[in-house]
Amino acid sequence: MSSAPVKVPRYYTVKTQIAELIDGAAPGTVLPTERELAVRFDTSRTTVRQALAELVVDGRLERTQGSGTFVAEPKIVQVRQLNSYTEDLRQQGRTPSSIVLSVTRERASDAVAANLALPPGAAVHRVERLRGVAGEPLAHEVAWLPGPLPRLRQELERRGSLYQTLREAYGIELSRAEDTVETALAGPADAQLLSVDVGLPMLLIHRTGYDPTGRPVEWTRSVFRGDRFRFVAVSSLDS
């Protein structure tokens, strides 16, 4: 028994047509107006508006109030490996930015304690940062670190990279990390920090980093803008 053909929504067809239109266009290229696109694709402005909105969420377009719709910069690709955000982007020739929002000592919650193999209530460092590229905010990150780490804020602000700071200032080397990646929607706090709309699709990543003895030395929660980031996982068969 053959199944009925799937009906493709009109806005999705228009979205595909606009995506083809901007393929190869330079970032910053201005798109025709909604009215012009509606005439070009023989559809309503409402349909065009929905198609454009999805392309904005996908990271293909950017909209500026009063200025129009533009082709967006390509998504930043981050290969998940044992590098810090700062080190990874420097290897790509980009200019990472990092603003330290706070560095505090607190009692570990049950979740933090479990991921760092500590008893609940143990003292940990909490490091909150806003990560970006060339000054554009792209990720909100909170890391929890065990152990005494004197002058952590000063050491971190001097180097920028958390892993470099742990290695050079405290002799802590990371040998492996475990990442969990899932989707999430931007809440009010992340939306305000990252200058995006509430409800924008985000990438939520939890990482646990281990030293060569297998001791957890980092648990990090990172929220990345889904319209600006694409993650790549590289796998290989064991010999």
Language-model regions, residue ranges each:
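Extreme N-terminal segment that seeds HTH/winged-HTH DNA-binding domains in transcriptional regulators
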Residues: 1-45, 50-53, 91
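C-terminal all-alpha effector/ligand-binding and dimerization domain
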Residues: 96-239
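Extended, compositionally biased flexible segments
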Residues: 39, 45-46, 50-58, 62-63, ...
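Beta-hairpin "wing" of winged helix-turn-helix
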Residues: 31, 56-66, 72
